[in-house]
C-alpha cells in the first residue's frame, strides 16, 4: 500500500496531473488507511490477544460493517443496480448513513477496548482504514455536485454523515500520532462553530448547521486546503 501511495504521488506530480480535489482526497483517505494500519489505538497490547470471545466477535462485526459501507459506496459509484438509485434512493441513502455511523462507532469502540497481540494487525483498525477509503470514494464520485453543495443548506444527510465520519477519523488518527493536545484544540474550534449564538461580545455569531459545517470542512477551505496541497 505504501509503495502504491508513493508511486501515485510521483506519477501525479511528475507525469500526469490529477484534478486537485481528487488528488487531495486520495492523499487524505489512503493516508488515513495507512495511518490506522500502522498506529494502534494505544501503546498497550494484550498478552493473550483479542482473538477469543467477545473481542473477536466485535472485531469481526466492525470489519463486516466497514466492508458493507465500502461496497455500498462502490455501488453508488458504479450505479449497480440503477433501479436502487432511481426508485429507492432515499431508502438506500438512509441505510448507508446508518450503517456508516454504526461501522465507525463499533470500530472505534473495538479498537479502544479490545487489545491485540503485539505484531498482529487489528481488524478494527483495518475497518477504520476501510471506512476512510469509503469516505474518500464517496466524495470523489460526487465531486461535481460536492463542489456546488458543500458548505450550503443543499448538502444532503449522506453528505453530512460522510464528512462527519471523515472528520472523526482524522481526529482519531491525530490523537494516535500527535496526542490529545491537537485534538482538543481542533474540538474547541469545532464547538465554536455551533456555540456562537450563546457566546458574548465579538465572539457571538449566528452559528452553523451540521450539514453546512461538516461538508464545508471537506473543501479547499478545510481539510483539502493549503496544508494538504503543499
What are these regions (language model features)?
Residues 16-23, 87-88, 147-230:
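Hydrophobic transmembrane alpha-helices of multi-pass solute/ion transporters
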Residues 1-154, 160-164:
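Conserved, well-structured core domains of diverse proteins
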Amino acid at each position: 500500500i505504501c509503495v502504491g501511495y508513493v508511486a501515485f504521488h510521483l506519477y501525479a506530480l511528475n507525469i500526469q496531473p490529477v484534478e486537485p480535489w481528487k488528488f487531495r482526497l486520495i492523499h487524505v483517505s489512503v493516508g488515513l488507511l495507512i495511518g490506522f494500519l500502522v498506529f494502534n489505538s494505544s501503546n498497550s497490547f494484550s498478552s493473550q490477544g483479542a482473538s477469543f470471545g467477545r473481542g473477536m466477535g466485535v472485531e469481526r462485526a466492525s470489519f463486516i460493517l466497514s466492508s458493507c459501507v465500502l461496497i455500498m459506496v462502490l455501488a453508488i459509484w458504479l450505479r449497480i443496480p440503477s433501479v436502487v438509485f432511481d426508485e429507492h434512493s432515499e431508502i438506500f441513502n438512509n441505510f448507508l448513513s446508518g450503517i456508516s455511523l454504526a461501522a465507525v462507532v463499533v470500530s472505534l469502540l473495538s479498537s479502544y477496548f479490545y487489545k491485540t497481540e503485539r505484531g498482529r494487525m487489528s481488524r478494527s483498525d483495518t475497518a477504520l482504514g476501510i471506512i476512510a477509503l469509503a469516505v474518500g470514494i464517496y466524495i470523489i464520485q460526487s465531486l461535481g455536485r460536492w463542489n456546488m453543495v458543500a458548505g450550503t443548506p443543499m448538502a444532503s444527510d449522506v453528505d453530512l454523515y460522510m464528512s462527519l465520519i471523515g472528520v472523526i477519523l482524522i481526529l482519531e488518527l491525530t490523537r494516535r500520532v500527535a496526542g490529545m493536545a491537537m485534538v482538543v484544540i481542533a474540538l474547541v474550534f469545532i464547538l465554536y462553530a455551533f456555540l456562537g449564538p450563546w457566546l458574548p461580545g465579538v465572539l457571538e455569531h449566528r452559528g452553523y448547521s451540521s450539514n453546512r459545517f461538516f461538508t464545508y470542512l471537506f473543501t479547499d477551505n478545510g481539510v483539502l486546503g493549503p496544508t494538504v496541497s503543499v
